[in-house]
């Protein structure tokens, strides 16, 4: 699947954004929120090189980004392309999507979908929403997945050739489960 560079970056950003949400572990104790305060939001903006975001982010921006994050999480949970499309349409419409070609900061020509001067939440909703729209239009909505490891659930985009990826990369969940299954088989064989 050929994905333009700017779309790939936006897909990586939306996955990272969704994965900042706290998880419930098996003991019922929640993990920390990766966007728990404005400083964490600044760090996210810097890490993902989000352009056009000023230095005056505040609690209102944080609340708006958390709302957008929750909507993106719903896209990853959508049971079908129509449901995903409806969610994405709402996000990009609310963001006031305004496509424009740009080249900046050493990046070649690419499309920004957010309006000039848009808030960080609208920026994320527009650019990341359009990247998710690209996946739906390409008939690839099923590539927007959650990790199948019982104690994970992180979002990821399955870009494998045969759409077979089941686990995220962030915790090497697949390796952990394969090792656990191997050890269980060895233990069973030794007992039998």
Question: Where do the model's predicted regions map?
Answer:
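Basic DNA-binding region of bZIP-type proteins
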Residues: 171-189
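Short alpha-helix boundary/capping motifs
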Residues: 100, 116, 160, 175-176, ...
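Juxtamembrane/interface motifs at transmembrane-helix termini
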Residues: 107-108, 166, 184-187
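Short linker/helix segments within small regulatory modules
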Residues: 158-165
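Short helix-coil boundary/hinge micro-motifs
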Residues: 1-146, 150-157, 191-192
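Residues immediately within or flanking Cys/His clusters that coordinate Zn2+
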Residues: 144-149, 165, 170, 176
């Amino acid at each position: 699947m050929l994905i333009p560079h700017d779309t790939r970056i936006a897909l990586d950003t939306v996955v990272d954004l969704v994965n900042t949400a706290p998880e419930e572990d098996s003991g019922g104790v929640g993990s920390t929120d990766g966007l728990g305060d404005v400083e964490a939001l600044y760090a996210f903006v810097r890490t993902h090189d989000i352009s056009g975001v000023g230095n005056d982010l505040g609690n209102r921006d944080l609340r708006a980004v958390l709302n957008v994050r929750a909507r993106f999480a719903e896209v990853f949970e959508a049971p079908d392309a129509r449901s995903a499309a409806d969610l994405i349409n709402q996000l990009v419409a609310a963001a006031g999507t305004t496509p424009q070609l740009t080249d900046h900061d050493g990046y070649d020509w690419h499309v920004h979908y957010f309006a000039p001067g848009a808030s960080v939440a609208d920026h994320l909703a527009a650019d990341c929403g359009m990247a998710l729209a690209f996946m739906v239009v390409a008939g690839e909505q099923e590539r927007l997945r959650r990790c199948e490891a019982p104690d994970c659930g992180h979002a990821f985009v399955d870009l494998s050739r045969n759409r077979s990826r089941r686990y995220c990369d962030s915790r090497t969940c697949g390796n952990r489960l394969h090792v656990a299954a191997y050890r269980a088989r060895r233990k069973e064989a030794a007992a039998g």
